[in-house]
């Protein structure tokens, strides 16, 4: 956006309102536009139903997003896959750049029960003759991506090999930038920033457009992502880690805070259909000194006290958060995590409570 582009984003799930999934230059789609396009899609669906099944919720939203972005004549669309890639609703477009940020065991019932199988699904977004950028991945998944790229004549750029960032210094054949500041907390965010920066530089090179280094620096420093290691209060972090790869990164950050002398504790809420036992075990094993509490939330299918044994169960996260804020001192930190749906609900509660008071 800093380079004058009209940038659209389609993400899921939403953290605030459903409009947040469909944005242009950071501004969510207006209610009037959403309703107008939803009515168009429902009319289209009437014809579709003669030969096909009813559209899913995600398919409806994807269509609304595509129509909105077309009407608004955007320059660039950042399109986040819903699940996997190969068979995902979003994979009907031919993107100039495909990006894989991580590969871990998640949605096994749909994507397969091995890292290699999931990598096959994720690499399904690679398009013949285009470009792809991947994070630093385990060797078995990296090889799957490389094989897929080779079969489609895709130019593949790999973190740690073709580009990297260490201590704020970005290195790539496209550019070298030093002393960059990242707005998002957590050392691991440098890896995410490197991935985003490499993708941006490739996009700009493809369009033969000049890069303003100062704009890049300002953009990285101002980056904010709701529900992703978000410091919503001075002593409360929200992080939508909902699988083991994401949880690994959160644990890294919690350990950093422990080393700085803070006393972190974790409030965990998840969906029953997720591998919550594996996530809880991972937290217990890797953060043995950190208080871990489990709670339910209003979303259908969330954990409750009958699903977990051996953990401190909190009946009401609302009362717990209120109590924490009343008694916490400057070295106490609360990390709320386990599910993006949980984070969305907690975030609305905290911000809504602030508005009321």
Name each model feature, range by range:
Residues 76-79, 89-99, 103-107, 117, ...:
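Nucleotide phosphate-binding/pyrophosphate-handling subdomain across enzymes
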Residues 13, 17-40, 109-126, 146-147, ...:
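Active-site-proximal loop->helix
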Residues 339:
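Active-site-proximal loop/hinge segments that shape catalytic or ion-binding/gating pockets
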Residues 48-49, 72-76, 80, 95-180, ...:
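Acidic, Mg2+-coordinating active-site environments of NTP-dependent enzymes
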Residues 10-13, 135-136, 148-166, 183-186, ...:
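Beta-strand->loop->alpha-helix junctions that form or flank phosphate-binding loops
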Residues 2-93:
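ATP-dependent carboxylate-amine ligase catalytic core
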Residues 73-75, 261, 329-331:
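Short, high-confidence coil segments that cap the C-terminus of an alpha-helix
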Residues 138-156, 166-168, 274-335:
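C-terminal helical cap/extension that packs against the catalytic core
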């Amino acid at each position: 956006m800093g380079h004058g582009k009209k940038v659209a984003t389609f993400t899921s799930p939403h953290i605030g309102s459903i409009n947040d999934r469909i944005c242009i230059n950071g501004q969510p789609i207006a209610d009037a536009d959403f309703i107008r396009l939803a009515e168009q899609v429902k009319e289209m669906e009437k014809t579709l139903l003669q030969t096909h099944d009813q559209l899913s919720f995600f398919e409806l939203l994807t269509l609304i997003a595509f129509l909105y972005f077309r009407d608004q004549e955007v320059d660039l669309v950042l399109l986040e896959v819903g699940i996997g890639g190969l068979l995902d609703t979003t994979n009907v477009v031919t993107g100039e750049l495909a990006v894989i940020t991580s590969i871990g065991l998640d949605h096994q019932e749909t994507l397969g029960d091995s890292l290699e199988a999931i990598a096959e699904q994720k690499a399904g977004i690679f398009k013949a003759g285009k470009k792809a950028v991947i994070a630093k991945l385990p060797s078995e998944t990296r090889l799957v991506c490389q094989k897929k790229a080779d079969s489609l004549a895709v130019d593949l750029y790999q973190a740690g090999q073709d580009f990297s960032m260490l201590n704020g210094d970005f290195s790539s054949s496209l550019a070298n930038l030093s002393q960059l500041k990242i707005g998002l907390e957590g050392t691991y965010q440098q890896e995410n920033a490197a991935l985003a920066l490499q993708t941006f530089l490739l996009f700009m090179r493809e369009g033969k457009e000049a890069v303003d280094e100062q704009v890049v620096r300002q953009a990285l420093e101002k980056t904010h992502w709701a529900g992703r290691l978000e410091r919503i209060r001075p002593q409360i972090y929200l992080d939508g880690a909902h699988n083991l790869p994401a949880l690994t990164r959160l644990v890294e950050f919690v350990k950093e805070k422990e080393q700085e002398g803070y006393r972190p504790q974790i409030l965990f809420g998840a969906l029953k259909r997720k591998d919550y036992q594996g996530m809880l075990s991972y937290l217990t094993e890797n953060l043995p000194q950190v208080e871990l509490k489990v709670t339910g939330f209003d979303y259908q299918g969330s954990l409750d006290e009958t699903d977990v044994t051996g953990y401190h169960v909190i009946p009401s996260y609302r009362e717990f958060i209120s109590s924490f804020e009343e008694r916490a001192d400057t070295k106490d930190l609360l990390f709320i995590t386990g599910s993006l749906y949980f984070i969305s609900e907690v975030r609305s509660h905290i911000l809504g409570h602030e508005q009321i008071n």
